[in-house]
Amino acid sequence: DVWDAFNQLQTYKDEIGDLFNTNAALVVSDGFTARVGSLTANAERMLPWRTIANEDDRPRLQMELETVVRGFFKPELFLDYVRHFVLFEQDGDHIAKKVAGYHQFHAVREAVRATVIAAQDVGKSVLEVHEERATYGKEVQPGSRKAGVVWHTPGSGKSITMACHAG
């Protein structure tokens, strides 16, 4: 099962840790079920990747592994992920690598788009947003300086979301 794959990678990490020095994210799968997390994540922080490009294209009957391959590893999304959604946190002598979950990834991408639109001067298109927005609620007005709020349930990673948005 998927947790056998997770345990196998933990063994590799312990025995040949240098192999993982440049690892951005860890994907474990049994060929159907798949989870994405960081190299230092425990099993509870290994989460499914539920979408391809945004919340509107969430596959219903697709294997989780296919969703990870088509969504998480889509080149332009993966490069954005590696650049903006991999974080490090020091806890004493230990450095933990943390990565955003799919919900954080898509929420931050939408929040950044909304922020860019709300921050631009009306009549000037210095900042252009080339991707179609996935809108939640009212449209963001250019120049309004009002970009909205990202809402998460308790324990779902608001700190990571805000760090990625600010970063």
What would you call each of these model-derived segments?
Residues 1-167:
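ATP-dependent helicase/translocase motor core
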